[in-house]
Amino acid sequence: MVRHELGKWNLNELIKNPNRAIVDKKLANIESTAKKFEKIKKSLNPNISSKKFLRLLHDIENIMEKSSLIGGYASLRYSENTQSDEATSFLTRVTKFGSDIENRLLFFDLWWKIQVDENNARRLIKSAGQLSEYLRFKRLLAKYSLSEPEEKIINTLDVTGATALVKLYDKITNAYIYVVTVDGKKRTMNREQLTTLVRSKKAKTREAAVSYTHLTLPTKA
């Protein structure tokens, strides 16, 4: 049976020379910035100046960009080897962290969608430049928004619910080696390779992909 060698990606563009101390420091900095941003909650007013409003938007953008970089790193590191307990644990930790950050910033999102009156909304959108369409879209979602506590629960459940199940599914199915007969020849492949065949232009190849003869766990060296 063919052995599949795991490759390793260079993720230095996301986090250079990553180690626990560096990641912890980055997460702490993001959390600190988010906590600082939270302090504006009580002072938010629909009559806010366009300049200050735009600055707040860029503050959120900066926080989410930094959080997304670490999230992307964790996700790609996990995809590199879904059988790694270390990578799985790290992704879970970072995903939960990202959810916590979203919950800290949620008040601003709901304030913009629900509490800002139409006249002030038009005024602020007009001076928002590239972010104007984003702000208009947010306003369209107002009627679907829940209370802040309810929205926070949904964000948390996204991490511990469906996302956790998908991760478990990936961990199980990516461990298998599939034996498939294609063009009269038996081939062994992993789930990603099998998925490619499922999307083949040839009907017989697609049929073979979903009718694999059996699957086994790979033999450890």
Which ranges hold each PLM region?
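A well-structured
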Residues: 1-215
